[in-house]
Amino acid sequence: MNEFKVIRNAHIYAPEDVGIQDVLICNDKMIDIQPNLVFSYDHEEIDASGKYLIPGFIDQHVHIIGGGGENGFSSLIREIQMTDCIQYGVTTVVGLLGTDAHVKSIEQLVAKTKALREQGMSAYCLTGSYAIPTTTLTGSIGKDIAFIDEIIGVKVAISDHRSSAPLKQELARMATECRTAGLLANKPGVVHMHTGKGKDGYKKILEIVEETDIPITQFRPTHVANQYEDALAFASKGGYIDFTADEKTPSLLKKTLEIVPLKQITLSSDANGSFPIWDENLNIVGMGVGKMETLYASIRSLILEEHVDISTAISIITKNVADALLLKQKGSIEKGKDADIVLLSLIHI
């Protein structure tokens, strides 16, 4: 049986500003968007007068089964809950492993992804972890992507003392395997790269792009503030760059928006990941935990403190991410798309 809702008088950023309109929802889809919408069937009415209606946020870097911790087994971090996500406007997540492949598995990751889906969220995940050889479910990166519905790419670490110091040829082969599997399964097949502060930077990736036929969009560096100049060089060749939300991110995003095309810039939270603090000799001296709320907090600061317009700011966690990950039903307020919606009171913006 179909269930209908009409959201009335919302100021819609789709993410572009389309003014005050009504939205008709049938089950989990938006089926009409227009001013003064007339609908005669039984339905629930939601008065959104004085509120902004924007797409649900897409967070493409979430430790949904908790990060590994890097200060002993007692520092293992708890798994995320659906309520942790939706209370901060996140309606779609991509889960992944980090340094924790010895104590947590791809099986656990896929199971948690399925659990979030059962609870009503849109959820995906990545095979792999920091390490090479790559941790997989089927024994093959390509088969994981091709045959496991939830898996849309692979995770690896570069330029970090905790990585496996992957060789250029290993990264190139990983990318081609992901690309081929992604084409077969109609998935992005991304190589999602934790990028540390190591001496190598993006050197190997930039050389692969220069020396091979692998499209630069196959590689998706995150934590790009760690190697900002290399990230700009990468973006100048057409690559996507993903920032990690923290208190310094809004000003860096503002700077980047003046240099890099908007569509290539995304933001993620690293929620429930471990945030180790290192001294100059790479000894651990402290530990933090990534928080889901930093995603929206960074966008809010980008609007209020850096004076970036609302449409541009929210694109970084909605449309841009959806387009980059081939999530065609996500990321914008349009007829026929998933009804992943966030309502914001004016006080929030």
Q: What role is predicted for each listed range?
A:
Residues I347-I349:
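Conserved small/polar residues in nucleotide/adenosyl-binding loops
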Residues P261-L344:
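His/Asp/Glu-enriched, well-ordered alpha-helical/loop segment
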Residues A10, D28, G50, H61, ...:
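Divalent metal-coordination and catalytic microenvironments
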Residues R162, E177-W278, I284-V285:
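Active-site core of metal-dependent hydrolases
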Residues A48-A111:
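Metal-associated gating/positioning segment near the N- to mid-region
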Residues D42-S49, M82, S140-I145, P250-L262:
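Short amphipathic alpha-helices and their capping/turn segments at secondary-structure boundaries
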Residues M1-K5, H11-I54:
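Histidine-rich, glycine-flanked metal-binding segment
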Residues T99-V110, M121-I214, P221, N226:
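Buried, small/hydrophobic-residue-enriched core segments of structured protein domains
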